[in-house]
């Protein structure tokens, strides 16, 4: 790296750090930390465990953000110091370049974290996949996407639980509901909400023709038990049925699986992962609340003409992203134009680039 390149890079860092400081509003963070301190010092703080947990999480998140921006500021000052002392071709110059590389990574990662500032971005995510028209080919595509999100969750250190699973008759998945748990799981995955289109030569077609398949991905923030969402008994219809496992095998012979229908909105939730009907109903109620929150978020954003992760009907022209396996290899997001040629890497869960491009595009609208 030449000296003029170093100077330009450090100037860019200075601008980005100022933007981060403004976005964070450090004064507001410090004021909130001062408010939290006496609340947590109260001897009765833990009497309400749910509220105490929420405040503790808020404290940790604010403290972490403050520490991160301070660390970035200090590392930037260190880089300026090395620039004054270092000479090209020397060991000190190598140290400066390493410092710049490290700082670049920290700033890029923190930029994304700062963008995840929505009310529910820090929540766990409820992710559902449903194949569109296309039979076995679409169901196989649904199974491939399920694996992609499981791999992505693994890279992030997230926990994945299958809440509802219905296998395809020949291959793939008819429908699946996943709970993905971890910091900012919803904030990261909300960009995946929409229709995903696959173009490939179908392994199920003996004539080796090219097929187009669609899968709808729905994502909602998981709402905890302290949520103020109210559900009236008269607004909910509950149906029970026998749960089934992968391949259609019966898990048990009792009617433990639960389907809840929210009559005013038509939202339907199916849960069958637990052996107890009571537990399945509790889980279904929680997910129903999550979906109602997601619907409320959409309505608010629609009024502002900024609906994030808009989901369309499953069909031609409605997709948010295309995955082309043949005649060439390319994954392209139609909202941001971000594209990747290494399709295997994407199918193995490397979707950070798509997520980051989406978050940045929404921030700069």
Swiss-Prot record:
Domain of life: Bacteria
Endpoints of the signal sequence: none
Gene Ontology molecular function terms on file: translation release factor activity, codon specific
Post-translational modification: Methylated by PrmC. Methylation increases the termination efficiency of RF2.
Subcellular location: Cytoplasm
UniProt keyword Protein biosynthesis present: yes
Keyword annotations from UniProtKB, A to Z: Cytoplasm, Methylation, Protein biosynthesis
UniProt keyword Lyase present: no
Cited Pfam families: PCRF (PF03462), RF-1 (PF00472)
GO CC terms, sorted: cytoplasm
Principal location listed in the UniProt entry: cytoplasm
N5-methylglutamine modified-residue sites: 249
InterPro entries: PCRF, Pep_chain_release_fac_I, Pep_chain_release_fac_I_sf, PrfB
PANTHER family registered for this protein in UniProt: CLASS I PEPTIDE CHAIN RELEASE FACTOR, PEPTIDE CHAIN RELEASE FACTOR 2
Protein's job: Peptide chain release factor 2 directs the termination of translation in response to the peptide chain termination codons UGA and UAA.
Family according to the record: Belongs to the prokaryotic/mitochondrial release factor family.
Protein name: Peptide chain release factor 2
């Amino acid at each position: 790296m030449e000296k003029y390149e170093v100077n330009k890079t450090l100037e860019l860092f200075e601008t980005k750090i100022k933007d981060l400081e403004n976005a964070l509003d450090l004064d507001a963070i410090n004021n909130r930390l001062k408010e939290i301190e006496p609340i947590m010092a109260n001897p009765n703080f833990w009497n309400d465990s749910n509220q105490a947990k929420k405040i503790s999480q808020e404290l940790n998140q604010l403290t972490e953000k403050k520490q991160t921006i301070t660390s970035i500021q200090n590392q930037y000052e260190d880089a300026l110091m090395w620039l004054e002392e270092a000479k090209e071709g020397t060991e000190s110059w190598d140290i400066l370049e390493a410092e710049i590389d490290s700082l670049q990574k920290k700033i890029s990662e923190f930029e994304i974290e700062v963008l995840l500032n929505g009310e529910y971005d820090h929540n766990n995510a409820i992710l559902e996949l449903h194949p569109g028209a296309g039979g076995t080919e679409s169901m196989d595509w649904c199974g491939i996407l399920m694996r992609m999100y499981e791999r992505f969750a693994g890279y992030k250190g997230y926990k994945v639980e299958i809440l509802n699973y219905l296998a395809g008759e020949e291959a793939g998945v008819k429908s699946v509901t996943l709970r993905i748990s971890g910091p900012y799981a919803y904030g990261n995955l909300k960009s995946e909400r929409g229709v995903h289109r696959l173009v490939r030569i179908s392994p199920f077609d003996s004539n080796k023709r090219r097929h187009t398949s669609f899968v709808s991905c729905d994502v909602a923030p998981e709402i905890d038990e302290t949520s103020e969402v109210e559900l009236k008994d008269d607004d909910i219809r509950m149906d029970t049925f026998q749960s089934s496992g992968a391949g259609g095998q019966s898990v048990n012979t009792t009617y433990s699986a639960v389907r809840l229908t929210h009559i005013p909105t038509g939202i339907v939730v199916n849960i069958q992962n637990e052996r107890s009907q009571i537990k399945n109903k509790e889980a279904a109620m929680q997910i129903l609340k999550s979906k109602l929150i997601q619907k409320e978020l959409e309505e608010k954003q629609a009024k502002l003409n900024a609906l994030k992760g808009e989901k369309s009907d499953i069909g031609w022209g409605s997709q948010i992203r295309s995955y082309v396996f043949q005649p060439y290899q390319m994954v392209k997001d139609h909202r941001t134009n971000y594209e990747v040629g290494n399709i295997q890497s994407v199918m193995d869960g490397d979707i950070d680039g798509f997520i980051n491009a989406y978050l940045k595009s929404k921030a700069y609208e």
